[in-house]
Amino acid sequence: NDIMTRMFGYFLSWMQEKTSSVYVIATANNAHNLPLELKRKGRFDEIFCVNLPNEDERKKIFKIHIGNKKQNLDEAALNSVSLITEGFNGADIESLVNEAVEKCFIDSLDNKGTAFDERLLKDIASKTVSITKSCKKQIDNMKKAFKENNFKDATTGKITT
């Protein structure tokens, strides 16, 4: 902990005293735990929050993970599963796709022939506990911190309200 304190102090001094243009990009899973000295004006020009993906973003995430697994889903099915997965983050969606592919594979070994399709994804999604349900309190606290600190939404570029 002593080393972290010294490194943090050194980092803050460096940020304050640097003489050339430097871009510092940092991430944090919990803005509440960031030290006040790091959040004060002048340390970072912009602070963004990355919210849960909206419907269009979820659709893009589905396309990526479905493509990575060499599967296909038509546009209407993509729209449908993107709509019903509100509150899912990228990891939730990846897990959903992985589970569907795994089910298709296991069923193929048993000659059941389960198809990778909208119905299968919806069935798995209905049984999936998304991060917004399993970590509701923490997510609500993070959203509160976004508002209190006037963080900008990374998708829209607007102050979180």
What spans do the regions from the language model cover?
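C-terminal engagement/docking regions of AAA+ P-loop ATPases
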Residues: 25, 80-95, 105-161
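Walker A/P-loop NTP-binding motif of AAA+ ATPase domains
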Residues: 1-82, 88, 100
